[in-house]
Curated annotation (Swiss-Prot):
Belongs to the bacterial ribosomal protein bL33 family. It comes from Vesicomyosocius okutanii subsp. Calyptogena okutanii (strain HA). The keyword Ribonucleoprotein applies. GO terms for biological process: translation. SUPFAM superfamilies: Zn-binding ribosomal proteins (SSF57829). GO terms for molecular function: structural constituent of ribosome. The gene is rpmG. The keyword Ribosomal protein applies. This is Large ribosomal subunit protein bL33. Keywords: Ribonucleoprotein, Ribosomal protein.
């Protein structure tokens, strides 16, 4: 079953993306390098729980 996750910028800008992942096949936390429009650079985004 796919679940929605929140990817938060490591640049501490408050910007985030939402994505889905299959937690049964990939139980580890996701870390992806994506563009942060606030700082206008590519930074690491880390998975956090959606409240």
């Amino acid at each position: 079953m796919r679940e929605t996750i929140k990817l938060v910028s490591s640049a501490k800008t408050g910007h985030f993306y939402t994505a889905t992942k299959n937690k049964r096949l990939h139980p580890e936390k996701v870390e992806v390098k994506k563009f942060d429009p606030v700082v206008r650079k590519h930074v690491m985004y880390k998975e956090v729980k959606i409240k």
